C-alpha cells in the first residue's frame, strides 16, 4: 500500500465550529445567510474533495456556527469552566475570559440539533442540556429540506457526485496532488485516478472573487 487511508473531517464533538475557525477574519456570516452559504459550500467542497472516509458532524451540513453564551453558567463543559477560571486567575476580567472560552469551547458543537423552528429547535419539549444557537430557526433542517438551493442540499449533491461511478476512482481513491500556482487564499488540488483521469478542485477561502489560472486540458 503506497498511500494511507484517513478519517477526513472538519468538525467533531471536541472542536468549535469550522466557520469560526476558518473565516474568523472575514465578514460575519451570522446575519448574512447568502454569505454563510458561500462559506459553507467552500468548506463542503474542500471536505468532499479529499481522499479518505468523510465524516460530516451534526449541524455542519446546515452551516452551524459557534453559539453565543452570555455567562459561564450557560456552559456545561467542565474544561470550559476550568479555562474560564484560569483566565480570571491570570488577571483577565470576566468579559475577556468569557470571550476566550466562547471562541474555543467544545460546547459550541454540542448544542441541540435544530430540526425545526419550534422551541428548542424541535429537539425536545423538555429542558435541553444546552440552549439552542440563537439563529437556529433561520438554518433549521426543515427549512433547508424545503429549499433546493440550501447548504444541506449542496452537501447531498456533493455526496452524489463523489459516489457517482464516473467520479469515484478519482474523488474517493485517487491521489491528491497540490496545484502549485494557486493564489494564497485559494486551496487548489487535483485528484488523480490510477488510469490518469483527473478532477481539479479549487476552493476560494477569501471574501473576494478570485481569478484562477487553470492550465489548458485540466
Feature map (PLM): residue ranges:
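Active-site and adjacent substrate-binding regions of carbohydrate-active enzymes
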Residues: 1-218
